[in-house]
Amino acid sequence: MAKELPVFPSPKQADTPEQEELTYSRVFCTREDSPPLKLLLDFLKSKNQIPLIPKMDPAALEDWDWVHISLGYSREKKPIQLFCVRDRGTYQDVCEGEKTSFFNRISVFDNIEAEIAREFISKAHFIATTQMVKKDVSEEGYDFNGWILEFFQENCNGIVQIDGQGFYSPKGELIVDMEEVAESGEEIAPTPRTDEQSLA
């Protein structure tokens, strides 16, 4: 009998009532290439955060072409899943689908802030997405997630989007309030399959 290996299901695979409710946040990044994970980990450590990561080849942390990693902030809590989809390569279709969906969702806004957000979306070369389990995440987890988002916003010329809220300026101000749009539409869960593409 074959050994059963742990598999991370895609958010849309299970439709059972006990399915965990997930929340997503993203950074639409206009920088050409995503930074290696080592830079993110160094940034988190510089902010007095201690990221818990799975055992992996140290060389993988130097690779810019990563797709997924689990980042723990507490041994008692589920880790934050971090995904990166790009405008080229394996998950190009996922990236383009995300960009089109969010561009269309904010097309109902006609202010200058929404125009800036649309420009970031259309020029994005990659999207860094975090996924958290709503009932499990703590205040510490939200803070940890905030540092992850800040890293990509500052280092990759990005704009932050949080589901159920909207788009944020670099100063942390809500500039496009999408709460009503989120309530009337389906939340997007655009993460790639993690059973085949995780770093661990």
Give residue ranges: language-model regions.
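Acidic (Asp/Glu-rich) sequence patches and key acidic residues
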Residues: 1-200
